[in-house]
Swiss-Prot record:
CDD domains per the UniProt record, alphabetical: PLA2c
Designated name of the protein: Acidic phospholipase A2 CbIalpha
SMART domains noted in UniProt: PA2c (SM00085)
An example molecular function term from Gene Ontology annotations: phospholipid binding
Top EC group: hydrolase
Signal sequence extent: none
Function of the protein: Heterodimer: presynaptic neurotoxin.
Chain residues that bind Ca(2+): 27, 29, 31, 48
EC number: 3.1.1.4
Cofactor entry: Ca(2+)
Cofactor note: Binds 1 Ca(2+) ion.
Family classification: Belongs to the phospholipase A2 family. Group II subfamily. D49 sub-subfamily.
Species assigned in the record: Pseudocerastes fieldi (Field's horned viper)
Active-site residues, record numbering mapped to chain: 47, 89
Length: 122
């Protein structure tokens, strides 16, 4: 769920998810359109695509089993749907962590009205 995803983001970036990523670029946060603004925003685009491939559950609300071990995020569900959601969140958190050095404060609270280019396909 979004709370667990936020914990993963904090674990990998040291940033508080809601403040730093809830309205970042064209894809971080609810929905998305246009072209990703940078590598961080691209992580969110890929995450949106991943959620789009998860069928049969509500990825934003699904509560899954996860733990943090030696700096890694471990998804522990046997339920295929919950595990898929966890893996989407895990991959995005890792991606955000790998791109934290290029995080651009100019894209915080970015207006979706600036995201008018044709959207990429997943």
């Amino acid at each position: 769920n979004l709370f667990q995803f936020g914990e993963m983001i904090f674990e990998k970036t040291g940033k508080e998810a809601v403040h730093s990523y809830a309205i970042y670029g064209c894809y971080c946060g609810w929905g998305g359109q246009g072209r990703a603004m940078d590598a961080t925003d691209r992580c969110c685009f890929v995450h949106d695509c991943c959620y789009g491939r998860v069928n049969g559950c509500n990825p934003k609300m699904a509560t899954y089993s996860t733990s943090f071990q030696n700096g890694d995020i471990v998804c522990g569900d046997n339920d295929l749907c919950l595990r898929a959601v966890c893996e989407c969140d895990r991959a995005a958190a890792i991606c955000l962590g790998q791109n934290v050095n290029t995080y651009n404060k100019n894209y915080e609270h970015y207006s979706i009205s600036h995201c008018m280019e044709e959207s990429e396909q997943c």
